[in-house]
Amino acid sequence: MTQYNKLRIEWDCRRGMLELDNVIMPFYRQHFDALSDTQKDTFIRLLACSDLQLFSWFFNRGMATDPQLQQMVDYIQKTLKLTD
Protein backbone atom coordinates (compact mmCIF):
# COMPACT_ATOMS: atom_id res chain seq x y z
CA MET A 1 0.00 0.00 0.00
CA THR A 2 1.36 3.37 -1.01
CA GLN A 3 1.59 6.22 1.48
CA TYR A 4 0.05 9.49 0.29
CA ASN A 5 0.75 12.93 1.68
CA LYS A 6 -2.86 13.89 2.25
CA LEU A 7 -2.09 17.45 3.29
CA ARG A 8 -0.22 18.00 0.03
CA ILE A 9 -3.01 16.43 -2.01
CA GLU A 10 -5.64 18.55 -0.27
CA TRP A 11 -3.57 21.67 -0.96
CA ASP A 12 -3.29 20.68 -4.64
CA CYS A 13 -7.08 20.25 -4.78
CA ARG A 14 -7.48 23.98 -4.17
CA ARG A 15 -7.90 25.61 -7.55
CA GLY A 16 -8.12 29.14 -8.89
CA MET A 17 -11.67 28.63 -10.16
CA LEU A 18 -14.64 28.20 -7.83
CA GLU A 19 -16.27 25.82 -10.32
CA LEU A 20 -13.31 23.46 -10.02
CA ASP A 21 -13.17 23.80 -6.23
CA ASN A 22 -16.81 22.67 -6.17
CA VAL A 23 -15.91 19.51 -8.09
CA ILE A 24 -12.44 18.48 -7.00
CA MET A 25 -12.51 19.15 -3.26
CA PRO A 26 -15.79 17.32 -2.53
CA PHE A 27 -14.61 14.33 -4.56
CA TYR A 28 -11.31 14.27 -2.70
CA ARG A 29 -12.91 14.53 0.74
CA GLN A 30 -15.65 11.99 0.11
CA HIS A 31 -14.08 9.43 -2.24
CA PHE A 32 -10.27 9.56 -2.33
CA ASP A 33 -9.73 7.00 0.43
CA ALA A 34 -11.88 4.43 -1.39
CA LEU A 35 -9.88 4.66 -4.64
CA SER A 36 -7.38 2.00 -5.64
CA ASP A 37 -3.71 2.99 -5.56
CA THR A 38 -3.74 3.26 -9.36
CA GLN A 39 -6.77 5.56 -9.25
CA LYS A 40 -5.16 7.64 -6.51
CA ASP A 41 -2.03 8.04 -8.64
CA THR A 42 -4.17 9.11 -11.60
CA PHE A 43 -6.09 11.59 -9.43
CA ILE A 44 -2.81 13.10 -8.26
CA ARG A 45 -1.64 13.40 -11.88
CA LEU A 46 -4.96 15.08 -12.69
CA LEU A 47 -4.24 17.71 -10.04
CA ALA A 48 -1.03 18.64 -11.90
CA CYS A 49 -3.07 19.80 -14.91
CA SER A 50 -3.94 23.45 -15.44
CA ASP A 51 -7.24 24.94 -14.33
CA LEU A 52 -8.13 25.64 -17.96
CA GLN A 53 -7.61 22.00 -18.90
CA LEU A 54 -9.61 20.76 -15.92
CA PHE A 55 -12.44 23.21 -16.58
CA SER A 56 -12.61 22.07 -20.19
CA TRP A 57 -12.67 18.39 -19.24
CA PHE A 58 -15.11 18.60 -16.34
CA PHE A 59 -17.56 20.86 -18.12
CA ASN A 60 -17.58 18.85 -21.35
CA ARG A 61 -15.75 21.30 -23.57
CA GLY A 62 -12.96 18.87 -24.40
CA MET A 63 -11.40 15.55 -23.53
CA ALA A 64 -8.04 14.70 -22.01
CA THR A 65 -5.61 13.15 -24.48
CA ASP A 66 -4.37 10.79 -21.76
CA PRO A 67 -6.94 7.97 -21.48
CA GLN A 68 -6.27 7.44 -17.75
CA LEU A 69 -6.91 11.10 -17.00
CA GLN A 70 -10.10 11.04 -19.07
CA GLN A 71 -11.26 7.92 -17.22
CA MET A 72 -10.71 9.73 -13.92
CA VAL A 73 -12.62 12.79 -15.15
CA ASP A 74 -15.48 10.51 -16.25
CA TYR A 75 -15.39 8.69 -12.91
CA ILE A 76 -15.53 11.95 -10.94
CA GLN A 77 -18.38 13.26 -13.10
CA LYS A 78 -20.32 10.03 -12.62
CA THR A 79 -19.60 9.82 -8.90
CA LEU A 80 -20.67 13.41 -8.27
CA LYS A 81 -23.56 13.07 -10.75
CA LEU A 82 -22.29 15.93 -12.93
CA THR A 83 -23.53 14.22 -16.10
CA ASP A 84 -26.77 12.57 -17.11
Swiss-Prot record:
Does the keyword Metal-binding belong to this entry?
no
Gene Ontology, cellular component aspect: cytoplasm
- Name of the protein in its database record: FAD assembly factor SdhE
Q: Where in the cell is it found?
A: Cytoplasm
**Biological process per Gene Ontology, one example term:** succinate metabolic process
Is Lipid metabolism set as a keyword in this record?
A: no
Stored InterPro entries: SDH, SDH_sf, SdhE_FAD_assembly_factor
Q: Tell me the keywords, alphabetical order.
A: Chaperone, Cytoplasm
> What is the residue range of the signal peptide feature?
none
Its lineage reads: Bacteria, Pseudomonadati, Pseudomonadota, Gammaproteobacteria, Pasteurellales
State where it is primarily located.
cytoplasm
